[in-house]
C-alpha cells in the first residue's frame, strides 16, 4: 500500500511540474512580440522565438507587428457649405513599439479607430463638398498625417488612409 501511495504522490507532483513548465514556455512568432511583465512591472518586449517565463511571476501580452487594415464606420458629416454627406474610410496601421502599444493605451486598435472617426468628421467638416470631391487625395493625406501624429505616442504608425 505504501508503494502505491508514494508512486501516486510522485505522479501527482510530476503532473504539477509539467503543467507549471508548460505555462512557463511560450512561442512568439516572427511577426509578433511578447511584452513581458514581472510582478506588474514592465520588463520589455521579447521575441521572436522561444520565451521562458517565471511561472506565476511573469505575464506576457502578445502584440502583432503586421499591418492592420480597419474599416472606419460610415460617418454622417456636414460639410462647411452645410451639405450632409456619409463617408467611410479604411485605415492601415501597424505597431512599431509594442511596449508603448500595451502600456500607453488600453486597446490600441479601438483607440485608433476612434481617433480616425473623430478626425474624419473634423477634417471633412472644415471643407466644402466641391473641395472634398476634387481633392480627395489631399484630404486622405491630411487624415493620415493627423491620425499618425495622434497615435505616435502609442507606438502606432499609420501608413495609409
PLM region descriptions:
Residues 1-161:
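N-terminal hydrophobic membrane-entry segments
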Amino acid at each position: 500500500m505504501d508503494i502505491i501511495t508514494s508512486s501516486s504522490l510522485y505522479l501527482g507532483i510530476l503532473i504539477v511540474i509539467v503543467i507549471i513548465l508548460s505555462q512557463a514556455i511560450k512561442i512568439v512568432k516572427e511577426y509578433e512580440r511578447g511584452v513581458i511583465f514581472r510582478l506588474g512591472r514592465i520588463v520589455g518586449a521579447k521575441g521572436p522565438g522561444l520565451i521562458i517565463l517565471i511561472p506565476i511571476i511573469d505575464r506576457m501580452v502578445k502584440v502583432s507587428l503586421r499591418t492592420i487594415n480597419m474599416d472606419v464606420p460610415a460617418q454622417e458629416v456636414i460639410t462647411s457649405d452645410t451639405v450632409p454627406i456619409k463617408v467611410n474610410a479604411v485605415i492601415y496601421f501597424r505597431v512599431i513599439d509594442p511596449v508603448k502599444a500595451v502600456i500607453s493605451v488600453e486597446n490600441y486598435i479601438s483607440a485608433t479607430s476612434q481617433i480616425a472617426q473623430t478626425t474624419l468628421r473634423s477634417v471633412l467638416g472644415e471643407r466644402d463638398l466641391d473641395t472634398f470631391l476634387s481633392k480627395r487625395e489631399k484630404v486622405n493625406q491630411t487624415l493620415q498625417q493627423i491620425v499618425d501624429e495622434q497615435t505616435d505616442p502609442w507606438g502606432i504608425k499609420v501608413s495609409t488612409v
